[in-house]
Amino acid sequence: MHTKSIELHNEALQHIVGGVNSPSRSYKAVGGGSPVAMEKASGAYFWDVDGNKYIDYLAAYGPIITGHAHPHITEAIKKAAENGVLYGTPTKHEVTFAKMLKEAIPAMDKVRFVNSGTEAVMTTIRVARAYTGRTKIIKFAGCYHGHSDLVLVAAGSGPSTLGTPDSAGVPKSIANEVITVPFNDIDSYKAALEKWGSEIAAVLVEPIVGNFGIVEPKEGFLEQVNELTHNAGALVIYDEVITAFRFMYGGAQDLLQVKPDLTALGKIIGGGLPIGAYGGKQEIMEQVAPLGPAYQAGTMAGNPASILSGIACLEVLKEKGVYEKLDHLGAMLEEGILKHAETHGITITVNRLKGALTVYFSDEKVENYEQAERSDGETFSTFFKLMLERGINLAPSKYEAWFITTAHTEQDIKDTLTAVEDAFKHLKN
């Protein structure tokens, strides 16, 4: 069934580290094997190198909210290619796009474009340090903020301890600048601030978690984080690389009505091309060069191809009924999965917000990383492979979300639920 994918992976292993260009693309987290190599994509569908067709819920880990090869976005990219994809000068398009982002996310007085979500988060931390004159940051356990050294840190031995590196090559001295606490645990957050508050430059928050599944904040949690952080003289940074434009036209901060000082963006805002952006209050953003002492630059930053693709993507998302459709299909999918699980005696918990959901093989409600970690990875691995065999492409990790796109249809959801029911039957047997 996947003969050419296996052959291609074996060849890739000779030339590319691990045979993949991002570790999340390997099947290591689901028991190993050769990852399926895709050849083309259109709408909600993939076709692999062996000619098999899939309904796609990976959506490239989030960016492809309008479906693959959306004609309006494709046309914008063609226009960029015809007029030159990289200038190294200012363009009118980057001004247009900055205005669109500011209108959509009012907490951003000023914006700066970069090349990825990792870069956006990395720079917001630098800006926060420049503004506050402090060095330490707080992050929440299990929340991924890119692969820069400072955020590749896991929790220490307790909720108020300094971090330990989560990757080889990250010096302990850098990890010492990071305090990790459990998400949705305001008491642990208070304890961290009581111990380190005068040294904290910023707290880094996914307002809605997307990296150990879709996990919403408890009522009042974000408001308390804001209040406590500002009382300590530190800044609040929202990592909205996954969440911005995912649940509404704007940021999760606007959905939840809680405003940060700085915001990091990526994924969806590029329409499928590489991009990142960060923005925030004017007096904080004025720390950035050429106005201030916090240096950040990029050869590819604000390139016309990514900018025009991003503008086109937001134009599609502004259309009437887009987010209502995503919510409707998400509810339909969640309801069907839960129904089939009950019918076949499969223990699961589903976390869903509008058009994104995570299926945990667990009997407990997931509100933090420890609970997500306790979900049954072995059962998920089997489920993942059963779904792949039935033409459903999911992320190869128990921690990731299923992303619905504007290209998905009710028939796609019905076909997916047929596959889910069959997979659950096999799991039970």
Swiss-Prot record:
Pfam families: Aminotran_3
Modified residues (N6-(pyridoxal phosphate)lysine): 267
Entry EC number(s): 5.4.3.8
GO CC annotation terms, alphabetical: cytoplasm
Signal peptide range in chain numbering: none
Pathway assignment: Porphyrin-containing compound metabolism; protoporphyrin-IX biosynthesis; 5-aminolevulinate from L-glutamyl-tRNA(Glu): step 2/2
Entry-linked PROSITE patterns: AA_TRANSFER_CLASS_3
Superkingdom of the source species: Bacteria
Gene Ontology BP annotations: protoporphyrinogen IX biosynthetic process
Keywords per UniProt: Cytoplasm, Isomerase, Porphyrin biosynthesis, Pyridoxal phosphate
Reaction(s) the record says it catalyses: (S)-4-amino-5-oxopentanoate = 5-aminolevulinate
Family from the record: Belongs to the class-III pyridoxal-phosphate-dependent aminotransferase family. HemL subfamily.
Name listed for the protein in its UniProt record: Glutamate-1-semialdehyde 2,1-aminomutase 2
Lineage: Bacteria, Bacillati, Bacillota, Bacilli, Bacillales
